[in-house]
A protein has these predicted regions:
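Rossmann-like adenosine-cofactor binding region
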Residues: 169-264
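Conserved beta-strand positions in the Rossmann-like core of class I SAM-dependent methyltransferases
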Residues: 164
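Glycine-rich NAD(P)-binding loop of Rossmann-like domains
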Residues: 119-151
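Phosphate/diphosphate ligand-binding glycine-rich loop within oxidoreductases
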Residues: 47-119
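Short acidic low-complexity segments
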Residues: 33-44, 56-59, 175-191
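N-terminal glycine-/charge-rich "phosphate-binding" loop or analogous flexible N-terminal tail
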Residues: 1-46
């Protein structure tokens, strides 16, 4: 029986059918089969799995896997799942970087131009202009300087914002004030008018934005979280908003998704809730990237470079 490529995850039959069609068109020499339709023999023989926010147990039920290709940039659900070294390939895609950078810029403008205040005033039928704050007078701090963070930094700089960036390890980027480590993070936070979280979720970044680090931000600063929910301690964020130390938070990711109806974030006047839409996967672009990785594997027998299991990205 010819080996198949497993497709694991997807949000229901409609998305599964869409992904299957686009991926199959990009890889005409491969036979992709959704996990739920695979026979026992196909599950035992599959060497490659393409995953979209999968149930880790389903991926672990493919004992012959040689490597796993994610259609998302984040792979935290898979790191540590397997009892053997297994390359996990996160999606590194120029189109995803472009759309994420676009979202960072859009919601930075939303905060810089006081849109939350004007929306509140409209509900109160209050006509009250606010002083204009130039982009050149606004400091944006980026938590994370990988492919997505670097693209966002470039877009913000081009728009005139002063950008500072933090990463776990030393990095340099032309025109960006960069820092790393615990000291570098605290040094950056004190300058931020807007803090953007775009860092992978790992054991080290879980709870990274806590009460102490929120307190280190400039009074009146705002927060954008486009990374993963657990990077920000929700209770600490709400306390900082309630005290007035933070002016607003734009949240696209949460500890539990979809965000439960009973969450206090829904009704909080200083929170904008988004349904995880900041960096959507463009399937045509992603399929081309995945197809190139798979062709290389078929030619060389070597899987692509995976995430560092110790770092989680």
């Amino acid at each position: 029986m010819a080996e198949v490529v497993a497709l694991v995850g997807c949000k229901g039959p409609a998305q599964e059918a869409e992904y299957l069609q686009i991926l199959s068109a990009a890889m005409p020499g491969e036979r992709l089969v959704p996990f739920r339709r695979m026979t026992d023999a196909e599950r035992a023989g599959a060497q490659v799995a393409i995953v979209a926010n999968p149930d880790p147990a389903e991926v672990a039920a493919l004992p012959g896997l040689v490597w796993v290709q994610s259609l998302w940039a984040g792979v935290e659900k898979l790191v540590g799942v397997f009892d053997r070294p297994l390359p996990i390939i996160r999606l590194v895609d120029r189109e995803m970087a472009r759309t994420m950078a676009e979202a960072v810029l859009a919601w930075t403008y939303y905060l810089q131009r006081d849109m939350p205040a004007y929306a509140s005033q409209q509900r109160e039928r209050l006509w009250q202009p606010h002083p204009y704050r130039k982009s050149t007078d606004t400091t944006v701090g980026l938590l994370g300087l990988g492919a997505l963070g670097s693209a966002a930094a470039e877009r913000l700089t081009d728009a005139g914002f002063f950008v500072r960036a933090w990463s776990r390890t030393p990095k340099t980027l032309t025109g960006i004030d960069t820092g790393h480590g615990a000291d570098g993070l605290l040094a950056m936070l004190g300058h931020c008018d807007i803090l953007v979280c775009i860092v992978p979720l790992t054991p080290e970044t879980r709870g990274l934005v806590n009460a102490a680090r929120l307190a280190a931000l400039k009074p009146g600063a705002a927060l954008i979280n486009f990374a993963r929910g657990p990077i920000v301690v929700t209770e600490d964020l709400i306390a900082a908003l309630d005290s007035g130390h933070l002016s607003h938070a734009v949240l696209d990711v949460f500890d539990v998704e979809p965000l439960p109806a009973q969450s206090p974030l829904w009704a909080h006047p200083a929170v904008t809730v988004l349904p995880h839409i900041s960096g959507p996967t463009d399937m045509d672009s992603a399929a081309a990237t995945v197809a190139a990785n798979l062709r290389e594997y078929r030619t060389t027998g070597q899987p692509p470079q995976g995430v560092d299991a110790g770092r989680g990205y």
